[in-house]
Amino acid sequence: VYGHEITNTARITKMNMILAGDGHSNIEMKDSLANPIDGTSTYTDENGVVHHNGFDIVLANMPYSQKTKYGKLYDLPSTNGDSICVQHCMKAINSASANGRMALVVPEGFLFRKDLTKTREYLLKNCQLQSIISLPQGVFLPYTGVKTDIIYATKVNQKIKDSERNKSFWYFDVKSDGYTLDNHRRKLDTPSDLSKYEEYRKFDKDQVENMLKVGFEIIPFDKVHRNSNILVGSRYREQKAIISNYDIVTIGDVATLVSGYGFPVALQGQAGTIPFYKVGDMNLSGNEIEMHDSRNYVSIEIAQERKWI
């Protein structure tokens, strides 16, 4: 295991690995972005044997929305840390490895922001995107409330013929990870969607019906390319006409609209009986709210205290 960490957390990591009896000598305290690893380069050992630099597998939960001064060291120079972090992880994969793959936790903004279009194009060109896992907002609380996704890709840094490329990738939307989506992160009695994702590992990926049964969606790359390489899977869902016996009413007739301040994070979560919605609950690519699936509830007592009811 190799790893870089810019803060003193690197020392804690090394200590934990020592206590666990695992190797720890390859954990270093340094700025990863200032020290890119070129997985396409080679070196010769003392016996004259040529080896490739880089790694077979890269796992990363990168810092979100940071700025960097080391963008010039990468193929797409930028001060945007999200772009450079993804490029750094890709660059570190051994190009000679037939099994070179990576799993990256990225802020959801990486999947749709206009200023990162070129980076997404670079990603799709230099690897085979296999799946994107959408995580619920709040999964990393209390450290950050940023909405995140997992990118899983194979054949990183390899030259892939067009005829060998997949025509689509899998998208899975996690609604619940088995814990409350608040600062307390209490374990829920209800099943976790992650248990469904575990089925992914058991299936032959060519058995499409089985994948669809556990909740995966197929996202065609041709649609992605026509939409600025936006990778938010929900954007490409087929719109189904819904016939309802209920009259259409304005939202003000069925809900209390409150604006002007943020709702305290400490009060957000699954505890309570009254659902509430925030601007952040909107689908980032479509301005639609899933009214049947609120991420947050509030108790009657708090709603009365806030004079909402």
Regions found by a protein language model. Give the residues of each.
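Class I S-adenosyl-L-methionine
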Residues: 129-158, 164-165
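Hydrophobic, well-ordered secondary-structure elements that form the walls
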Residues: 89, 151, 234
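Non-catalytic DNA-recognition/assembly elements of restriction-modification systems
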Residues: 205-264
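Short, surface-exposed amphipathic charged segments that create phosphate/polyanion-binding patches used
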Residues: 40-45, 144-152, 185-193
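Sequence-specific dsDNA recognition surfaces
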Residues: 252-267, 282-309
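Short, intrinsically disordered, charge-balanced linker/junction segments flanking boundaries
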Residues: 58, 168-175, 185-209, 280, ...
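SAM-dependent methyltransferase catalytic region
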Residues: 1-127, 131
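Short, well-ordered beta-strand micro-motif
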Residues: 152-154, 173, 278
